[in-house]
Amino acid sequence: MAVRFIREDGDEILRKVSKKVDVIDERIKTLLDDMAETMYAANGVGLAAPQVGVLKRVVVIDVGDGLMELINPEIVEQEGEQIDIEGCLSIPGVAGEVKRPARVVVEALNREGEKITVEGKELLAVALCHEIDHLDGILFTDKVIRFIDEDEMERRRENKRRNKIRQNKG
């Protein structure tokens, strides 16, 4: 396993449509391993193959419930809407509010080539949509409603910490 270089906004590969994976071989499994290591090293919750320079429909996600590896992911169902703050490892220092579905169902293959179905709500729904967008050359900044500056981000983090403390006491 190896940490790969994360491509940043302005790199043309981030704007290209990724190709479907036809065969899950050792190269794809190594890619999955490297992507997970890269995502964790960068403190991310998701990473798509184009972000490490590979135009294949492969993503890894971990929103705190364990690593998810998705090959050829496709959103097959979505409902509701939510607005949340997003950032991106390929666009460091930038955050903004983005409207996404509140719930999505994604079909994909796992590393063994088995079909899997993932239902995502809240943060997982956001992460699934965000990473699948990468596979189509779409960045979150294309969908941003409003950019958030660092001061506002810090205020929101502090409010979340306070709310967690209140919940734990109550």
Curated annotation (Swiss-Prot):
Q: Which cofactor does it need?
A: Fe(2+)
Q: Which Pfam families match?
A: Pep_deformylase
Can you name one GO molecular function term for this protein?
Answer: peptide deformylase activity
BP GO terms, sorted: co-translational protein modification; translation
Keyword field: Hydrolase, Iron, Metal-binding, Protein biosynthesis
The reply on keyword Transmembrane helix is: no
Top-rank lineage group of the source organism: Bacteria
What InterPro entries does UniProt report for this protein, alphabetically?
Peptide_deformylase (IPR023635), Peptide_deformylase_sf (IPR036821)
Q: Which residues bind Fe cation?
A: C88, H130, H134
Enzyme Commission (EC) number? 3.5.1.88
The record describes how the cofactor is bound as: Binds 1 Fe(2+) ion.
Reaction equations catalysed: N-terminal N-formyl-L-methionyl-[peptide] + H2O = N-terminal L-methionyl-[peptide] + formate
Active site, per annotation? E131
User: Main role?
Assistant: Removes the formyl group from the N-terminal Met of newly synthesized proteins. Requires at least a dipeptide for an efficient rate of reaction. N-terminal L-methionine is a prerequisite for activity but the enzyme has broad specificity at other positions.
- What family does this belong to? Belongs to the polypeptide deformylase family.
Under which name does UniProt file this protein? Peptide deformylase
- Protein species of origin: Acetivibrio thermocellus (strain ATCC 27405 / DSM 1237 / JCM 9322 / NBRC 103400 / NCIMB 10682 / NRRL B-4536 / VPI 7372)
Gene name of this polypeptide: def
